[in-house]
Amino acid sequence: KTNMELEAEDSGVLLKITRQAGETVPVTEVIGYIGAEGEVVADNSTSAPAAEATAQLEAAGLEVPKAPSQPSPATEEKAALADNEYDIVVVGGGPAGYYAAIRGAQLGGKVAIVEKSEFGGTCLNKGCIPTKTYLKNAEILDGLKIAAGRGINLASTNYTIDMDKTVDFKNSVVKTLTGGVQGFLKANKVTIFNGLGQVNPDKTVTIGSETIKGRNIILATGSKVSRIDIPGIDSQLVMTSDDILDLRELPKSLAVMGGGVVGIELGLVYASYGVDVTVVEMADRIIPAMDKEVSLELQKILSKKGMKIMTSVGVSEIVEGNNQLTLKLNNGEEIVAERALLSIGRVPQLNGLENLNLELDRGRIKVNEYQETSIPGIYAPGDVNGTKMLAHAAYRMGEVAAENAMHGNVRKAHLDYTPAAVYTHPEVAMCGLTEEDARAKYGDVLIGKSSFAGNGRAIASNEAHGFVKVVADAKYHEILGVHIIGPAAAELINEAATIMENELTVDELLQSIHGHPTFSENMYEAFADVLGEAVHNPPKRK
């Protein structure tokens, strides 16, 4: 991806170059020889040093990528492609799909992409982006509440929510970004087909009356809203994230079934608009995949914002009457609301893939570490494999699938340090293991924490709530997990992901300098607290 100068550790003259510019070179491969002037390098001298270096690395427990034993599809002679044939046919234009299509084209492939609806997938059209436009509104409303205390005297504290303008603005944002995705595809000469693609075992894809063929197929059909089978669930007053974002009239009350990321984010939006919101979650806390301490802190903050949160309880029946709903809970209680939001998660979207007879795991397409399915040459990155239902994870899986489709299975998808965030106020983010999981796996761990209550930037911004929590291995100080609740958590967590991906220890991280005044100083303080060295924290008890 870059050109850089490398300083030779030995002096001498360049005797021989064994690899040329533009070649892909495996780790430990010899690329040239330095020696005394006039010295001769034998033609077969490239293999021994490389083999010795490889053996040393493998003995140390490190994985060394191997050059493919057979010529890759990108380098061997190929028959010419017919007009309706492609190196890669991508089915689905969401994050995994469009990313894979563009990456395949960058690698010199002839690529087609099939999309039945709008490009950008759930994230862009009905998920990440639309919810962030609404959550920004909630943030602005929070700002109005503290304006007077900061010396900003508003002529009136009264405001109204114009849902028509809210929805129209959201739609304009979505339109801008979906158009951008199509622009990138066209710029990379990816052929676009609109319609539902029916994929066949012979790697043909039928779109309406047209059939195209791929040497490789990438299935990126994404996911859909998960539903529950209880009486009354089909009421028109029960919405999902697919339709609540187009609601142009605010209900007086909203019952949210599911306290995961989507339910909590949308619940907060409507609570900030003045709607009476009740969240019902079957687990013992909201967003149960998050670190328990962080989850409980968020629950406490949201309760103070007016959201009613009920945990360890489920909905057994919904009764509609008098333009409202009665949700009957399995503990005998009832909730009455004008509308309900079903947000219990998502499941893979398999429409158009019925003919393939792929191996599935609980309804998810089973893939190997190369993103390849049970059928060689057919890959399935993103939500459809259920590994990590996050857009940024889908980007990586799509990228890996495209590279493997073009070059043979040469790259694995490493997703252990994929960050995740909840865009509430305050934000929540995590990367790596929770404290509970780390203790179960490693036994003795160290915990470092630093509160935003002592962070100068947070205090000045009226955002002095929450904390950063670091989980580290007690022996080597390896960073096992980072968890944040507080301002800019979704931005700060990317520092943690980079640190962990590059295997920096706490001791090594503390060699860095963080700017002041910044929210990210709290990251440094939490890392220092792992070792009991945080200057702005009270001394740890011995």
What are the roles of these predicted feature ranges?
Residues 89-91, 197-198, 212-222, 256-257, ...:
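Short hydrophobic core segments
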Residues 1-44:
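Small cofactor-carrier domains centered on a conserved lysine used for covalent cofactor attachment
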Residues 87-113, 262-272:
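N-terminal Rossmann-like FAD-binding beta1-loop-alpha1 element of flavoenzymes
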Residues 79-96, 250-262:
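Beta1/beta-strand and adjacent pyrophosphate-binding region of the FAD-binding site
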Residues 91-93, 105-117, 129, 133-140, ...:
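Flexible, glycine-rich terminal cap/loop adjacent to redox cofactors
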Residues 231-251, 334-407:
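FAD-site-proximal beta/loop scaffold in flavoenzymes
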Residues 36-85:
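Intrinsically disordered, low-complexity linker and terminal tail regions
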Residues 71-77, 84-85, 102-109, 114-250, ...:
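Glycine-rich flavin
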